């Protein structure tokens, strides 16, 4: 069914998830077949009962994992502006227009996907941390967001084809990278023409302990650093950078747009189209 285009195969460690494909013309056939199955079908009822048990188990495991990381999570959040204030400013930057397809790189708990759920046609979150993916998946399932999914993926080598998304977001993720320009180039690769990349991260700071205690590779970024990365990735910079001053960390929102695919095609990873197989 994967080869026929009815299902997508999403490897995650030793496990493999499957979902109905929504990326080609055969996906409508899959949805039509599903619609023909009566809700009272005995096998379907048993399957749904088992699915609910699996979801409950996932939610419990996700909550257990989050309890383990909650202290460090809250310690970081206490250093900058409240989360809701940051969400509001992000929505302001995105604007009121319809988004289309969204890619959240380093999705964590899936919060960005959730707050934009009613504005997108389809949402994908990628993360390397299986524990965080479990939290995000549980949150998305509990919210009933069937047009959103998460999968394991590396920000340096996204499991996506070229020019497949309209908006990519790196929300408080880039400071974990030892090579930010490559992350931004990879994000540019998957953007469609006129697609946008939004980076939310810390302004340059001197809180050195964040390296050792929280594994931050970079102590924030200057405007020039991000702008240079955007330009190197073939993106057109939006000069309207947003700033939310916190104590001691200030959060900034930079954004840029892809005017054409020419700049990224030369940097495209030739293996990209094989990653979903």
Where in the sequence are the language-model features?
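Class I SAM-dependent methyltransferase SAM/SAH-binding core
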Residues: 101-105, 109-157
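C-terminal alpha-helical "lid/dimerization" subdomain adjacent to the S-adenosyl-L-methionine
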Residues: 196-255
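A short acidic, Gly/Pro-enriched loop at the edge of an enzyme's catalytic core
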Residues: 156-167
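Amphipathic alpha-helical dimerization/coiled-coil segments
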Residues: 25-72
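A short glycine-rich, Lys/Arg-flanked "PGG" loop and its adjoining helix->strand segment in the class I
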Residues: 181-196
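Conserved alpha-helix/loop element of class I SAM-dependent methyltransferases that forms part
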Residues: 81-100
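Short, Lys/Arg-rich nucleic-acid/phosphate-binding segment
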Residues: 11-17
């Amino acid at each position: 069914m994967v080869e026929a285009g009815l299902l997508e195969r999403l490897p995650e460690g030793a496990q493999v998830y499957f979902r109905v494909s929504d990326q080609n013309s055969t996906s409508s056939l899959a949805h039509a077949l599903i619609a023909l199955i009566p809700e009272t079908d005995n096998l379907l009822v048993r399957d749904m009962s088992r699915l609910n048990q699996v979801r409950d188990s996932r939610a419990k495991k996700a909550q257990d994992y989050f309890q383990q990381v909650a202290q460090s999570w809250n310690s970081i959040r206490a250093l900058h502006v409240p989360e809701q204030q940051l969400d509001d400013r992000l929505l302001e930057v995105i604007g009121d227009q319809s988004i289309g397809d969204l890619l959240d790189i380093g999705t964590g708990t899936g919060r960005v996907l959730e707050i934009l759920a009613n504005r997108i046609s389809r949402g994908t979150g990628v993360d390397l941390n299986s524990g965080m993916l479990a939290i995000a998946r549980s949150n998305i399932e509990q919210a009933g967001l069937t047009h959103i999914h998460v999968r394991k993926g590396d920000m340096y080598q996204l499991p996506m084809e070229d020019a497949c998304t309209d908006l990519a977001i790196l929300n408080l993720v880039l400071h974990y990278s030892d090579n930010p320009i490559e992350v931004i180039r990879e994000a540019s690769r998957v953007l469609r023409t006129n697609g946008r990349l939004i980076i939310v991260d810390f302004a340059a700071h001197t809180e050195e302990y964040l390296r050792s205690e929280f594994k931050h590779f970079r102590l924030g970024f200057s405007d020039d650093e991000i702008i240079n990365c955007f330009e190197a990735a073939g993106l057109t910079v939006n000069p309207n950078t947003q700033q939310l001053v916190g104590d001691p960390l200030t959060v900034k929102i930079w954004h840029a747009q892809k005017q054409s695919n020419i700049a990224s095609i030369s940097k495209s990873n030739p293996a990209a189209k094989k990653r979903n197989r």
